[in-house]
Each structure stands twice: as C-alpha cells, then as structure tokens.
Design a protein with these regions (language model features):
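A broadly tuned "polar low-complexity/structure-edge" signature
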Residues: 3, 25-29, 68-72
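A short, charged, amphipathic alpha-helix used as a generic interaction element across diverse proteins
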Residues: 12-14, 23-48
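Short beta-strand segments
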Residues: 17-20, 66-68
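Short, mixed-charge low-complexity intrinsically disordered segments
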Residues: 37-72
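Short, intrinsically disordered, low-complexity terminal segments
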Residues: 5, 25-26, 50, 55
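Alpha-helical interaction segments
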Residues: 12, 21, 56-60
Length: 72
C-alpha cells in the first residue's frame, strides 16, 4: 500500500473502491486526468495500477451529480 497525492488529496493504493462526488463533469474529468497523469509521470502503468476508472452520471433529488469511481 502506498499513499499518493492527487489534487491536494491523499489516496491510498490498495483501497477496494473509492467514490468521489463532483458538482460538474469538468471537475470529475479533471480529477480523473490528474490520476492518470500522476501514474504516467511516476512510471506506474495505468491499467496495471487502476482496476477500473469511469465517470458516472446520476440525477438525484438535489439535481445533477457526477461521480468518479476508481479502484487501486
């Protein structure tokens, strides 16, 4: 297990699944790109390190919410 910093937030590898909620698609996409960029810059294979990563769109009672799922 290892802790990496993405957009000022510490993430621990080895986590089963993490769900992060955003208020805009742009924020969710930027977050995803930041993770990929970090893995590329540190020579960690994206496919090898992340089990999956996808952006999900859901509409709830409070309006639109964008969620980013990633798995180490």
């Amino acid at each position: 297990m290892e802790t990496i910093k993405i957009m000022g937030e510490n993430l621990t590898t080895g986590a089963k699944k993490v769900l992060k909620e955003f208020h805009s698609f742009k924020d969710a996409a930027t977050y995803g790109r930041s993770i990929k960029k970090y893995l590329k810059e540190t020579n960690k294979g994206y496919e090898e390190t992340l089990g999956f990563a996808s952006i999900c769109y859901a509409v709830g009672p409070n309006g639109h919410k964008y969620q980013y799922y990633y798995c180490f």
